[in-house]
A protein has these predicted regions:
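Glycine/proline-enriched, intrinsically flexible loops and inter-domain linkers
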Residues: 1-227
Length: 227
């Protein structure tokens, strides 16, 4: 309670709204009121159960040693080049991007494509902060990272490099990566056994490993993974 004002001031520095919503006492009950009427009155012991306990055994399979980081033998460089250029992951997304009006935002700093011929995709998004009066030179940056082939070979390595790639793109755009926050998105197959559960477990470990190495935290995201 004595730290509430300091906590609120820290939140304000991050442009976040914070307010005191409850007082903690030793009654052992959670009581909520609305317009003077008591609408919730439940035991703290019930809350401590945190619902049904859920535990899973996982098996994290070792990735194939003859995998992603092993350089293939080059027999026909022309054929390999054409195969790489025909990969959907290397295809131009300009047609899709142009279906959205990238000029509608007054705070837009980077266009989706740049360079002499307006064909080079930007490493991420940059936009000025909205201000009520005057002008600002302050902007926010956002970038993403994901390697589908790497993640298929090893969810652990996929998560590690997803975090690293997104932060690297921020650096390439000129942002201070030390002030970055992460948000993680997940999508996995139906989880039915120890091996399938091992895939999201490995990805979580990989993401957390890189978060700890960089000293960056995840502050929420889509679905369930950022927690």
């Amino acid at each position: 309670k004595e730290d509430a004002d300091r906590f609120i001031s820290y939140a304000a520095e991050e442009n976040l709204e914070a307010t005191v919503i409850a007082d903690v006492n030793d009654s052992g009950r959670l009581v909520m009121t609305w317009r003077g009427d008591k609408i919730v009155d439940i035991s703290r012991a019930f809350l401590n159960t945190n619902g049904a306990s859920q535990r899973k055994d996982v098996y994290i399979a070792k990735p194939d040693e003859e995998g992603f980081f092993v350089r293939p033998e080059i027999k026909d460089i022309r054929a390999m080049w054409l195969e790489a250029m025909g990969d959907l992951n290397n295809a131009s997304q300009q047609g899709l991007v142009e279906r959205f009006d990238s000029t509608v935002g007054a705070g837009t700093v980077l266009m989706p494509f740049g360079g002499r011929y307006q064909k080079t995709p930007a490493d991420g998004m940059a936009a000025k902060f909205p201000v009520r009066r005057g002008q600002t030179d302050s902007a926010s940056f956002m970038a993403h990272g994901f390697g589908p082939d790497l993640a298929e070979w090893s969810p652990f390595h996929g998560a590690v490099y997803a975090v690293l790639l997104s932060v690297t793109r921020l650096v390439a755009m000129g942002a201070d990566w030390r002030r970055a926050y992460l948000t993680l998105q997940e999508y996995f197959e139906k989880l039915t056994d120890r091996t399938s559960w091992g895939k999201p477990a490995a990805a979580l470990l990989g993401a957390f490993h890189m978060q700890a190495a960089l000293g960056l935290g995840a502050i929420g995201g889509k679905d369930s993974m950022s927690g």
